[in-house]
Amino acid sequence: ACLVGSEMCIRDSNCYCEFVGKKEPIEVGADICVGSLIKNLGGGIASNGAYIVGRSDLIHLCSERLNVAGEAKEVGPSLGANKMFLQGLYFAPSVVASALKTNVYAAYLLEDLGYEVSPKWNEEKSDIVLAIKFNDRNKLIKFVEGIQSASAIDASCVPIPTKMPGYDDEIIMASGSFTQGSSIEISCDGPLRSPYIAYLQGGLTFEYGKIAVLKAIENIK
């Protein structure tokens, strides 16, 4: 929640969640909702950008803050990005469906192998993220390395645990994506601390996601 003047507003960060459920936050009470276009809503096509949706008066305030006071959404360059934004939005439902299929597939296989996963393959999803508990430092590292080795870009690179700003522990991350930082393509990361949980998300196509999951599982056997 946040204050706008003297009014309390409900603000939601919707990253990883778009098109997963039947309703979006603004349909169930949120006043304003924000998210990234290099995640679900960009459909793997948008290479940058973010979005804001919600009450028109709040959108107006945001546009004045982000652009120019008094001009709001009436002016401002698009820098030729509108095509990829709209094309990404067009493909987003299908891409998110593929990411969810990858999530279910990975959850089923890993649970069958004895690993604790959340959510389980047959549980309702609220986002595209799958948490996998390894209880083993080396297996976490090997799983993330497996995802990287099946990535479309930089498959030959080997992720190395390292310190990152904002974290107390070393982080290992696989993200061999066409767009740097994109998590809808296929990515996996986790902190190097007990119980050694990896967070898997994405899959532009189920076929692509399936190969990455199988490669990662093969790497921890």
Predicted feature residues:
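Single conserved hydrophobic/aromatic residue that forms the stacking wall/gate
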Residues: A1-G5, C9-I10
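Catalytic cores of alpha/beta
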Residues: F19-P25
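Active-site C-terminal subdomain of aminotransferase-like
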Residues: I38-K139, A212, A216-I220
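Conserved C-terminal alpha-helix-loop-beta "cap" of PLP-dependent enzymes
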Residues: E111-I220
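Fold-independent oxyanion-binding glycine-rich loops
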Residues: D12-C15, S36-I38, R55-S56, D189-G190, ...
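Short, solvent-exposed amphipathic alpha-helical segments in soluble enzyme
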Residues: I26-E27, Y51, N67-V68, E145-S151
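General beta-strand structural signal in soluble alpha/beta enzymes
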Residues: R11-N14, C33-S36, P119, A155-P159
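Conserved active-site segment immediately N-terminal to the catalytic lysine
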Residues: P25-N40
